[in-house]
Design a protein with these regions (language model features):
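Conserved C-terminal structural/oligomerization subdomain of aldehyde/semialdehyde dehydrogenase
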Residues: 34, 131-249
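N-terminal Rossmann-like NAD(P) cofactor-binding module of classical short-chain dehydrogenase/reductase
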Residues: 1
Length: 249
């Protein structure tokens, strides 16, 4: 069993294959979060902030970036900033609720993602203190390092769209994410949307909560991992079913 990066996950799988040892890999990816026209901008923003910035963005199922309907983009950004101030105050560096980055190496990686980006909010960091301010970025192209690699930190890129053909094109750039989310007041559409793409697990009108349900299996698919665990699935993952029969003589 391994939890970590795709790069190391491949190494683990290669080494396990030498011994024909089965593995469960819980990896990651760029988890998209689509914001259609939700019933409540306030609740949507609150749930995005919680899911994205918990543990300073260092969770494998955090929304990596938002794909937002142009009609509500400005309202949503304004409310996300408001919810950030409510969660971590206007000075997150002084908030006991706001975390720190795991290492100086990761700080250097995150700071490199900001190069040549349009910062809408935040962007300040202190490598020595391992502090990285909650940051919102407006995305106009997908060629940057920020939009090619998993972030795993408190940087939230926002991409706008006008129609779902654009959303489809964007999502297909990032195959097999570990998680996918959509906020919409049309639940039937939300279900149909999530059923259209391969990913590990997700939610409609929330983020990350699926990991807390011990009746749901948790795991990735393709580049985001293989195998599953949680609840009954954990016993199955760490067990070998050894069938046999007994017949009378």
């Amino acid at each position: 069993f391994f939890t970590g990066s795709i790069t190391v996950g491949k190494i683990v799988a290669q080494q396990a294959a030498k011994h024909l040892t089965p593995v469960t890999l819980e990896l990651g990816g760029k988890n998209p979060c689509v914001i259609d026209e939700p019933a409540s901008i306030k609740v949507t923003a609150k749930r995005i902030v919680w899911g994205k910035f918990t543990n300073c963005g260092q969770t494998c199922i955090a929304p990596d970036f938002l794909i937002v309907n142009r009609k509500i983009k400005e309202k949503l950004i304004k409310e996300i900033i408001n919810q950030l101030s409510l969660a971590y105050s206007n000075k997150p560096i002084e908030s006991i609720e706001y975390g720190r980055i795991i290492s100086e190496k990761h700080m250097n990686y995150l700071s490199s993602l900001l190069e040549d980006q349009k910062i809408l909010y935040g962007g300040h960091f202190d490598i020595e203190k391992k502090y990285f301010e909650p940051t919102i970025i407006e995305i106009n192209n997908f060629d940057s390092k920020l939009m090619k690699e998993e972030i795993f930190g408190p940087i939230l890129p926002i991409v706008e769209y006008d129609n779902f053909n654009e959303v489809d094109e964007i999502i297909k750039r990032y195959t097999h994410p570990l998680a996918m989310y959509i906020f919409t007041k049309n639940i039937a559409f939300g279900k149909k949307f999530l059923e259209s793409y391969p990913f590990g697990g997700g939610a409609i009108n929330d983020t990350v909560v699926h990991i807390a349900n011990d009746r749901l299996p948790f795991g990735g698919v393709g580049s985001s991992g293989m195998g599953k665990y949680h609840g009954k699935s954990t016993f199955e993952t760490f067990s070998h079913y050894k069938p046999y029969i007994s017949r009378p003589l």
